[in-house]
Amino acid sequence: MDRTIADLRKDYTLEGLSEIEVDPNPFIQFKKWFEQALAAQLPEPNAMTIATSTPDGQPSARMVLLKDFDEQGFVFFTNYNSRKGQELAENPQAALVFWWAELERQVRISGRVEKVSESESDYYFYSRPANSRLGAWVSNQSEIIASREVLEQRMQEFQHKYENQEIPRPAHWGGLRVIPSEIEFWQGRSSRLHDRLLYTLLNDHSWEIHRLSP
């Protein structure tokens, strides 16, 4: 065993997380924590890991950016033909993880996934810088390419194609919404006795809260 890795550890001492203090609505609680992450000026507080899997259970995970959230769910945008897009089309379940190290906090979210409306995808797509919109056309995401020059050549081609005209949203690009059935809030505590509060969605659409052992 490499002790330089095994001995890496940090004791968490900032604050606790109490059932009495949290909001009974997990979306309101998430908003509170997210606003605190923004106020702390964390780098990309909307960065999250999304884990997907094939129907036979082969998992994959990657970082994406949260672009919206409300009581309907948590929204991100992607190429629907990418690996995650294809896996979610076949198995529309996902897990999200936010890690805010400076606040010693983690949020885990799991639930089903659905596409957002065409109008929602359009609204976000047309708010993006022109080169980002072109990038949605240039990249056949997750496909093997021979070299970076392939991307640069395709960028030049699409820059020429859409010169002096509006860049349309590709049909294969848009938003996905994770509709949670569980949301867990984790607060680091001393001696690895962390606080974990799990919100679970009930059949009547209310949420119950349970404390989990760390």
Curated annotation (Swiss-Prot):
Binding site for substrate: R9, K10, D11, Y12, K67, Y124, R128, S132, R192, L193, H194
Function description: Catalyzes the oxidation of either pyridoxine 5'-phosphate (PNP) or pyridoxamine 5'-phosphate (PMP) into pyridoxal 5'-phosphate (PLP).
PROSITE patterns in alphabetical order: PYRIDOX_OXIDASE
GO MF: FMN binding; pyridoxamine phosphate oxidase activity
Enzyme class: oxidoreductase
Subunit-level organization: Homodimer.
Protein biosynthesis found in the keyword field: no
HAMAP family (alphabetical): PdxH (MF_01629)
InterPro entries linked: Pyridox_Oxase (IPR000659), Pyridox_Oxase_CS (IPR019740), Pyridox_Oxase_N (IPR011576), Pyridoxamine_oxidase_dimer_C (IPR019576), Split_barrel_FMN-bd (IPR012349)
Keywords recorded for this protein, A-Z: Flavoprotein, FMN, Oxidoreductase, Pyridoxine biosynthesis
Binding site for FMN: 62-67, 77-78, 83-84, 106, 141-142, 186, 196
EC number of the protein: 1.4.3.5
Descriptive protein name: Pyridoxine/pyridoxamine 5'-phosphate oxidase
GO biological process: pyridoxine biosynthetic process
Cofactor requirement: FMN
Pathway membership, UniProt: Cofactor metabolism; pyridoxal 5'-phosphate salvage; pyridoxal 5'-phosphate from pyridoxamine 5'-phosphate: step 1/1; Cofactor metabolism; pyridoxal 5'-phosphate salvage; pyridoxal 5'-phosphate from pyridoxine 5'-phosphate: step 1/1
Co-factor remark: Binds 1 FMN per subunit.
UniProt similarity note: Belongs to the pyridoxamine 5'-phosphate oxidase family.
One Pfam family from the record: PNP_phzG_C
UniProt source species: Nostoc sp. (strain PCC 7120 / SAG 25.82 / UTEX 2576)
